């Protein structure tokens, strides 16, 4: 439910989070493919790095949400399924969230850092939960959002607007 942002935890927002999370846990807890619950995507890492945080209360609110509120809800509604506070994480509390020897890591230097594919051979992560390289959608998909065949060019205005990574096209 949470990714790539920091939130001010007002009482109303906390109540909303609790209600929405309870609804989702009840809806999903019996699915055979559920391996674990994860509190958020990339937020522990970016808060630890000082990105996105504008005031100390946001760090406190982060800890309260992902290391207290959500675990309490899961203890009540799905105590059998493992909870991991963030991805990447080394287990929470901002304890080196990208440690390659504990928890999980996200490694995007090949894509975002323009390193060669062989760079993956330099690392032996305990668990790389995110990595990769972007590719184009299928031509059939491209035709669904382009009206003019000239827009099929990867440098066309339409294709550039569909690209969200600064190092792409």
What label would you give each PLM region?
Residues 37, 72-75, 84-87, 91-94, ...:
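Substrate-binding clefts and catalytic carboxylate motifs of secreted carbohydrate-active enzymes
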């Amino acid at each position: 439910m949470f990714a790539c942002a920091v939130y001010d935890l007002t009482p109303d927002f906390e109540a909303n989070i609790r209600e929405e999370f309870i609804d989702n846990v009840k809806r999903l807890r019996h699915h055979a493919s559920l391996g674990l619950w994860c509190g958020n995507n990339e937020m522990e890492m970016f808060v630890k790095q000082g990105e996105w945080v504008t005031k100390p209360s946001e760090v406190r609110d982060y800890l309260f949400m992902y290391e207290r509120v959500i675990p309490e809800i899961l203890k009540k509604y799905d105590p059998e399924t493992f909870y991991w506070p963030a991805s990447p994480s080394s287990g929470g509390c901002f304890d080196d969230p990208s440690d390659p020897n504990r928890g999980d890591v996200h490694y995007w230097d090949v894509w975002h850092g323009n390193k060669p594919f062989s760079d993956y051979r330099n690392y032996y992560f305990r668990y790389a939960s995110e990595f990769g390289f972007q590719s184009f959608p299928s031509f059939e998909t491209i035709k669904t959002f382009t009206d003019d065949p000239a827009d099929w060019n990867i440098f066309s205005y339409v294709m550039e607007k569909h690209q969200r990574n600064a190092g792409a096209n």
